[in-house]
Regions:
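N-terminal pre-Walker A segment at the start of P-loop NTPase domains
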Residues: 16-125
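Histidine-centered divalent-metal-coordination microenvironment in nucleic-acid enzymes
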Residues: 1-2
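Conserved AAA+ ATPase small/helical "lid" subdomain
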Residues: 289-319
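Phosphate-binding P-loop
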Residues: 124-134
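Conformational switch/transducer regions in large eukaryotic molecular machines and scaffolds
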Residues: 83, 96-100, 110-114, 118-122, ...
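Short, aromatic/basic amphipathic alpha-helical patches
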Residues: 177-187
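Post-Walker A helix-loop "phosphate-sensing" segment adjacent to the P-loop in P-loop NTPases
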Residues: 156-167
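Conserved P-loop NTPase motor cores
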Residues: 134-157, 172-176, 189-290
Length: 319
């Protein structure tokens, strides 16, 4: 969980569905497959995945008196003890150094608000189950980065959470190998129909609209698609319209300013994005520092940031 400046209390993450908790991601694969990750507006302490392995480099000061082989043996013993859920006073036969280090490790675990999944599992972003809450996902990345895959996952979960609602697709492409394989497939809206008869916003009451690579439209198509995006972004809360806007650009001056201001979630692909573009977006719209943005580069293929309180950050294996 990434700490964003301005928060007085650090919100907590857990698998516990308690009052006030909001779902943010679903675990796919591994031991925790099917579990939902919730965010709490306080420092709630709840169930989490098993901690990942202990990294000796984080405790070099405590380990410096030991030989390399002894360090490995000690870390392995403490790893086994932590996996069993043992307290420090339950370490029978352990050295004083080992017990002291183990207490430090457990203290670090208690303070850590982040969650890391093993390689055999991953997070999938979850839309809100609240029928009265609409969301705006801004998903930006180069061609082939996986924007359609992320959008498909969100839209399919939206349909499961709200089975009576429709998912619409507005795209320049007549066919999409990812989005069109949703089950059931999204209902396509032709660009020409928007040009010929611009729709009233009430026609998008209680639904989800996917705008696929909307920045590639030109001419009249560009005008009507951008107008519809702007109208739904600013007034879609009245029609309860969730939006998934896929773009090649992280920022594009006036064309993206309004949408980015209204977005509830921003999904980016740090490893395939220039540091300048990434840091500008995250500093301007999230409040991240340059060091925060450098950390994003280490978090995997994609990163999703929730802009509103309580703010959170989630990637493929980390939250």
């Amino acid at each position: 969980l990434k700490k964003i400046s301005g928060l007085r209390k650090m919100p907590a993450l857990s698998f516990d569905k308690v009052k006030g908790a909001e779902p943010i991601a679903l675990v796919k694969g591994g031991e925790d497959d099917g579990k939902v990750l919730y965010i709490h507006k306080d420092d709630y302490k709840g169930s989490k995945p098993k901690r990942s392995e202990i990294h000796a480099k984080e405790y070099t000061t405590e380990l410096r008196s030991l030989k390399p082989a002894e360090r490995v043996q000690l870390i392995n013993r403490l790893q086994e003890a932590r996996d069993k859920g043992l307290a420090a006073d339950q370490l029978v036969g352990e050295t004083a150094l080992g017990k002291s280090l183990y207490e430090r490790i457990l203290a670090d675990d208690a303070k850590d608000t982040s969650i890391n999944l093993p390689d055999d599992s991953q997070f999938q972003i979850v839309p809100s189950p609240d029928p009265k809450k609409r969301e705006v996902f801004y998903i930006a990345g180069a061609s082939g980065s996986g924007k359609s895959y992320i959008a498909k996952g969100i839209a399919e979960l939206y349909r499961k959470l709200h089975p009576s609602r429709q998912v619409y697709l507005i795209s320049k492409l007549e066919e999409d190998s990812t989005l069109d394989t949703m089950s059931p497939p999204p209902k396509r809206i032709s660009i020409q129909s928007l040009i010929d008869d611009f729709p009233d916003l009430e026609e998008f009451q209680d639904c989800c609209v996917i705008f696929d690579d909307y920045d590639t439209f030109t001419g009249d198509a560009e005008k009507v698609v951008h107008k519809l995006i702007d109208d739904l972004a600013t007034m879609g809360r009245h029609t309860n319209t969730t939006m998934l806007c896929l773009s090649h650009y992280l920022t594009n001056y006036k064309k993206t300013r309004l949408l980015l201001n209204e977005a509830t979630h921003i999904v980016v692909y740090p490893m395939a994005t220039s540091f300048h573009a990434l840091s500008y977006l995250m500093k301007t719209h999230i409040g991240m520092s340059r060091d925060d943005c450098r950390d994003l580069k280490k978090m995997g293929r994609w990163v999703c940031v929730y802009k509103h309180y309580p703010q959170w950050l989630c990637s493929l294996h980390h939250a």
